């Protein structure tokens, strides 16, 4: 069934580290094997190198909210290619796009474009340090903020301890600048601030978690984080690389009505091309060069191809009924999965917000990383492979979300639920 994918992976292993260009693309987290190599994509569908067709819920880990090869976005990219994809000068398009982002996310007085979500988060931390004159940051356990050294840190031995590196090559001295606490645990957050508050430059928050599944904040949690952080003289940074434009036209901060000082963006805002952006209050953003002492630059930053693709993507998302459709299909999918699980005696918990959901093989409600970690990875691995065999492409990790796109249809959801029911039957047997 996947003969050419296996052959291609074996060849890739000779030339590319691990045979993949991002570790999340390997099947290591689901028991190993050769990852399926895709050849083309259109709408909600993939076709692999062996000619098999899939309904796609990976959506490239989030960016492809309008479906693959959306004609309006494709046309914008063609226009960029015809007029030159990289200038190294200012363009009118980057001004247009900055205005669109500011209108959509009012907490951003000023914006700066970069090349990825990792870069956006990395720079917001630098800006926060420049503004506050402090060095330490707080992050929440299990929340991924890119692969820069400072955020590749896991929790220490307790909720108020300094971090330990989560990757080889990250010096302990850098990890010492990071305090990790459990998400949705305001008491642990208070304890961290009581111990380190005068040294904290910023707290880094996914307002809605997307990296150990879709996990919403408890009522009042974000408001308390804001209040406590500002009382300590530190800044609040929202990592909205996954969440911005995912649940509404704007940021999760606007959905939840809680405003940060700085915001990091990526994924969806590029329409499928590489991009990142960060923005925030004017007096904080004025720390950035050429106005201030916090240096950040990029050869590819604000390139016309990514900018025009991003503008086109937001134009599609502004259309009437887009987010209502995503919510409707998400509810339909969640309801069907839960129904089939009950019918076949499969223990699961589903976390869903509008058009994104995570299926945990667990009997407990997931509100933090420890609970997500306790979900049954072995059962998920089997489920993942059963779904792949039935033409459903999911992320190869128990921690990731299923992303619905504007290209998905009710028939796609019905076909997916047929596959889910069959997979659950096999799991039970």
Curated annotation (Swiss-Prot):
Gene3D superfamilies: Aspartate Aminotransferase, domain 1 (3.90.1150.10), Type I PLP-dependent aspartate aminotransferase-like (Major domain) (3.40.640.10). It is an enzyme of class 5 (isomerase). It holds the Pfam family Aminotran_3. It catalyses: (S)-4-amino-5-oxopentanoate = 5-aminolevulinate. Its main location: cytoplasm. Disulfide bonds: none annotated. Its EC number is 5.4.3.8. It is found in: Cytoplasm. Pathway: Porphyrin-containing compound metabolism; protoporphyrin-IX biosynthesis; 5-aminolevulinate from L-glutamyl-tRNA(Glu): step 2/2. One of its GO terms (molecular function) is glutamate-1-semialdehyde 2,1-aminomutase activity. PANTHER family: GLUTAMATE-1-SEMIALDEHYDE 2,1-AMINOMUTASE, GLUTAMATE-1-SEMIALDEHYDE 2,1-AMINOMUTASE 2. HAMAP family: HemL_aminotrans_3. Belongs to the class-III pyridoxal-phosphate-dependent aminotransferase family. HemL subfamily. This is Glutamate-1-semialdehyde 2,1-aminomutase 2. It comes from Bacillus subtilis (strain 168).
